[in-house]
Regions:
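Short charge-dense sequence patches
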Residues: 60-73, 107-125, 164-168, 205, ...
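Short, charged low-complexity intrinsically disordered segments located at boundaries
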Residues: 146-158, 198-208, 246, 303-307
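Catalytic core of non-heme Fe(II) oxygenases with the double-stranded beta-helix
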Residues: 172-297
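Charged interaction patches that mediate protein-protein contacts
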Residues: 1-14, 169-171, 175-179, 190
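Non-heme Fe(II)/2-oxoglutarate
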Residues: 83-181
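Fe(II)/2-oxoglutarate
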Residues: 1-101, 297-313
Length: 313
């Protein structure tokens, strides 16, 4: 190996080692939005990005493969057909079942492939690189920020490619299909993982999301049972509450304006992947519009707008 290659490898390894040596901000400091927390993430953003790249390169042979084959075959095939011929999008629509007004469910991931996704997240959590947990309404100890707009996000290039594919190929056209008014308010993305554990994470009070559309996917393994942690969706017109339980690999997609709440988890653990879409500078539709006409071929496109740096939390 020549000297330049040796120096490059040494510098790269040093980045990973330096990232692992960083002291994470305390839980209290994060919850209190202490200025030092923001300074920590801003100061080390480049270092952490490089460390994740190096970690992925070093761990490549041990990391599970995550790609489109992790998705449910029926959904994958219907979406592929719609991208080739948008007039076939009805087959995608037929896979989504309305649970309550404005809330739809579908088998999103293949339950037998969830283990690969979970193993990847577990490997990332054990990487020793500072990873920012979600702390919007509450701090979730086992979760991670996933989008490049978020500080402390999971910056491994292979994961980022998969994450972007979920948003561009699947979530955005599906949201446009189910919620016509979302079109044009879906140029920006946001995502995080959460992991609720009994006796650790409290319930999540009723709230709405700062999104045009939210996709929430159950990442539990088929034999990974839990009790409690049901999600309540609130019909603002009738006041009725629909309590739902996610099965492994099932996704719920809804407008961000739909109020919902998570009940306390009483045993076991629950893992979820949450993805948001919204417009530039965090704009969201003011009203629902079931009758808005959008040509199918426009639904199955990827926005050309540049990603901004606005983040909900």
């Amino acid at each position: 190996m020549n000297n330049s290659v040796t120096l490059q490898a040494s510098a790269s390894n040093s980045q990973l080692q330096r990232a692992r040596a960083l002291p994470m901000p305390s839980r209290d400091a994060m919850l209190q939005r202490d200025l030092s927390v923001q300074q920590f993430w801003d100061t080390h953003r480049g270092l952490l990005r490089d460390a994740w790249r190096e970690w992925e390169e070093q761990s490549q042979s041990d990391l599970p493969e995550i790609n489109e084959t992790c998705l449910d075959q029926h959904l994958r095939e219907a979406v592929a057909d719609a991208w080739l011929d948008p007039s076939k999008e009805a087959a995608v629509r037929a896979l989504w079942h309305e649970e309550v007004p404005g809330v739809y469910s579908c088998q999103f991931f293949d339950p037998e492939k969830i283990a690969s996704l979970r193993n990847y997240f577990d490997s990332a959590a054990d990487a020793g690189i500072p990873l920012r947990p979600p702390y919007g309404i509450a701090l979730n100890r086992g979760g991670a920020m996933l989008d490049v707009r978020s500080e402390g996000y999971l910056a491994a290039p292979g994961f980022q490619a998969f994450y972007q594919q979920l948003l561009d190929t699947y979530m955005r056209p599906i949201a446009r299909l189910l919620f016509p008014e979302v079109f044009g308010y879906d140029t920006q993305t946001f995502g995080f993982s959460i992991h609720y554990q009994a006796d650790t994470d409290a319930s999540l009070r009723p709230h709405t999301d700062a999104s045009a559309a939210t996709l929430n996917i159950n990442m539990n393994l088929p034999d990974e049972a839990f009790t409690g942690s049901e999600v309540d969706f609130i019909n603002t017109d009738s006041g009725q509450v629909k309590r739902t339980v996610f099965k492994p690999g099932v996704a719920m997609i809804h407008r961000g304006s739909v109020p919902h709440a998570a009940q306390p988890i009483t045993s076991g653990s629950r893992a979820n992947l949450v993805l948001w879409l919204y417009g530039d500078r965090m704009q969201i539709p003011r009203f629902t519009d079931e009758e808005r006409l959008v040509d199918a071929k426009h639904r199955w496109t990827v926005p050309t707008e540049i990603s901004d740096d606005f983040a909900p939390f």
